Amino acid sequence: IVGFDSEGIILYRHGAIPLEAIEEVTGKPVRQIAQHVQIDTPGQLKSHYAPMKKVVIGNIENDLARYVNAAVIFFGNKNINAKNQFNLSATKNLKEAAANLFMALRQMDESNAEVILCELLPEEGLGRAINDRLKRAAVK
């Protein structure tokens, strides 16, 4: 979500179009709004993407030792020992991961697990938007 003011372009929330692409097309730098600033734009509620189950963002391997009955959402080629798991993209394709994110959250939320574990993706391109959604899902 972007907006404009007298100083230029403002990025309110990362989405499918990477920040760098907006800057390239417009030829202008894009300012990002601080997360603590209250903005009246769609999707800005802190828990906008929150499933019913608790979502924990961290190191999956470490967190699996703490949570016995956990569902796991992960990215890339990992050997995860969990009954309920969803790989956003085995090939680390951010576009594929973005397309799978809400299905993953929904399926893991509907599982018999007590908690959903996930890690943040690379902070580049669509990874920023995916991480934003994961962080919102983790807010309770």
List where the protein language model places each region.
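Active-site-adjacent structural elements in enzyme catalytic cores
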Residues: 1-140
